[in-house]
């Protein structure tokens, strides 16, 4: 009989949700070949980002995601106290990210989206369907944080200029790009036997085919957005990333977006949100974690 229990303690629900959020960000970063985005091949359309930086940034956010889940467990309901706690924790997480990356914004949009989803999942751990988690996240997003900084982000400025839905509105409407595009395509491609990496690429492309990506609009205007949406649809129409014809179209899209300096960072954040909701829906947080 051993004198000590050498087994690792079971992670708490908050720890497990933070694990899943960070895993989703790393899985998104590693996914290759993504058009004009940082991946295992290179930096895409970015001069200030690389894969190692994306990994370090994701890992730096683990404490913030855990604290968001803990806040949801403590406060127990959708309301202004939780919304403002999430805002404060998110801003602290952003500072930790910037300290890690030397001031480069790697995951600001992801802190917002995944933070809301982590908190929403913690509020009702047994209600794991993607729709129910997204609805709770939307109810949180609709509440006004009195302490949020007033200056508009680049994404918010672009959303106003072009009259499109930004990251804030995407969350407030219950993540339609995730529930209607990313997750259904992920499941379809899996069902067709395309393999997990191809299924994730197809999910990204499905989001890109319809999303008014404010990152693309900021960097390349309406021409860039049109190229992204039409090119992504062409890949899917050719059979997706698992087919030879689809791969050719994907390569063409990559070159076109690189030429336009159009990096679909908004779509990448929503792919990470799709991957997180997929894991929550499968019961990974509840099955491996406990309060």
Curated annotation (Swiss-Prot):
InterPro entries: CitG, TriPribosyl-deP-CoA_syn. GO terms for molecular function: ATP binding; triphosphoribosyl-dephospho-CoA synthase activity. Keywords: ATP-binding, Nucleotide-binding, Transferase. The keyword Kinase does not apply. Gene3D superfamilies: Triphosphoribosyl-dephospho-CoA protein (1.10.4200.10). Pfam families: CitG (PF01874). It catalyses: 3'-dephospho-CoA + ATP = 2'-(5''-triphospho-alpha-D-ribosyl)-3'-dephospho-CoA + adenine. Its EC number is 2.4.2.52. GO terms for biological process: prosthetic group biosynthetic process. Involved in the formation of 2-(5''-phosphoribosyl)-3'-dephosphocoenzyme-A, the prosthetic group of the acyl-carrier protein of the malonate decarboxylase. Belongs to the CitG/MdcB family. This is Probable 2-(5''-triphosphoribosyl)-3'-dephosphocoenzyme-A synthase. It comes from Pseudomonas fluorescens (strain ATCC BAA-477 / NRRL B-23932 / Pf-5).
């Amino acid at each position: 009989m051993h004198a000590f229990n050498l087994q690792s303690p079971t992670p708490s629900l908050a720890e497990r949700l933070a694990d899943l959020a960070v895993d989703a960000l790393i899985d998104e970063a590693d996914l290759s070949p993504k058009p004009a985005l940082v991946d295992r091949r290179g930096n895409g359309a970015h001069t200030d980002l690389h894969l190692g930086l994306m990994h370090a940034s994701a890992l730096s956010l683990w404490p913030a995601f855990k604290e968001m889940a803990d806040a949801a467990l403590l406060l127990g309901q959708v309301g202004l106290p939780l919304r403002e706690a999430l805002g404060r924790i998110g801003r602290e997480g952003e500072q930790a990210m910037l300290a890690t990356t030397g001031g480069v914004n790697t995951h600001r949009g992801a802190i917002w989206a995944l933070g809301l989803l982590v908190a929403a999942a913690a509020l009702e751990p047994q209600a794991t369907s993607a729709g129910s988690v997204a609805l709770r996240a939307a109810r949180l997003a609709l509440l006004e944080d009195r302490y949020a900084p007033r200056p508009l982000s680049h994404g918010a400025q672009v959303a106003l200029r072009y009259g499109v839905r930004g990251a804030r509105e995407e969350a407030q409407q219950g993540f339609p790009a995730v529930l209607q595009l990313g997750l259904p395509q992920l499941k379809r491609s899996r069902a067709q036997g395309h393999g997990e990496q191809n299924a994730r690429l197809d999910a990204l492309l499905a989001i890109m085919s319809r999303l008014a990506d404010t990152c693309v609009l900021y960097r390349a205007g309406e021409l860039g957005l049109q190229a992204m949406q039409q090119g992504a649809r062409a890949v899917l129409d050719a059979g997706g990333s698992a087919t030879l014809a689809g791969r050719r179209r994907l390569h063409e899209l990559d070159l076109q977006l690189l030429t336009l300096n159009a990096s679909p960072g908004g779509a990448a954040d929503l792919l990470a949100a799709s991957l997180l909701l997929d894991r929550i829906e499968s019961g990974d947080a509840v099955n491996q974690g406990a309060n």
